[in-house]
Amino acid sequence: MARYRGPVEKIERRLDADLGLKGERRLSGKSALEKRPFAPGQHGQRRAKISEYGLQLREKQKVKFMYGISEKQFRNYFKEAVRREGNTGAILISLIEQRLDNVVFRMGFATTRANARQFTTHGHVLVDGKKVDIPSYLVKPGQKIEIKEKSKSNPQVVRALELTNQTGMVDWVNVDKDKVFGIFTRIPAREEVVIPVEERLIVELYSK
């Protein structure tokens, strides 16, 4: 599946979930989901009853759109989660949380994961002092994530860091806002990752 490039707020309304796709706008209370909390289209206000399969598929779609990953990438993450010992759903979410673009977002260097992905592919991100321009790179505990020196004054980065005063920072990263770098201290437990997803339904979907 190609990456979706249409209006992201329609996706949030269709999936009936705040996926953090609009960044700063969602903090203003002016997002389309808050103004029109129903599906887009002529009959959007009358949501049809969703089948069990539909519910399972919706949870998978939430993860894919939230983290900006393709169907192929998602399947690979799921296969790896199944291979590892433990709760498959929890491992799946933890794996995806290790993506470099997501860690850049979690550290407050970008207002959305899409911006973090773009920033990464354009070569503005260093991992342990070396440029890594692959958004799907899995960050390991203890690794240092830094914005390149000439990009630290980028207005988007500055604004994103300012917004962390309002949104806060997750517990599994340690960030120096002045020097614009952070340490990915550990892989988060599933209960720490606050996202509107029931991964149990995703596991059921792939268990058929």
Swiss-Prot record:
CDD domains: S4 (cd00165). GO terms for molecular function: rRNA binding; structural constituent of ribosome. GO terms for cellular component: small ribosomal subunit. Residues 98-161 form the S4 RNA-binding domain. One of the primary rRNA binding proteins, it binds directly to 16S rRNA where it nucleates assembly of the body of the 30S subunit. With S5 and S12 plays an important role in translational accuracy. Part of the 30S ribosomal subunit. Contacts protein S5. The interaction surface between S4 and S5 is involved in control of translational fidelity. This is Small ribosomal subunit protein uS4.
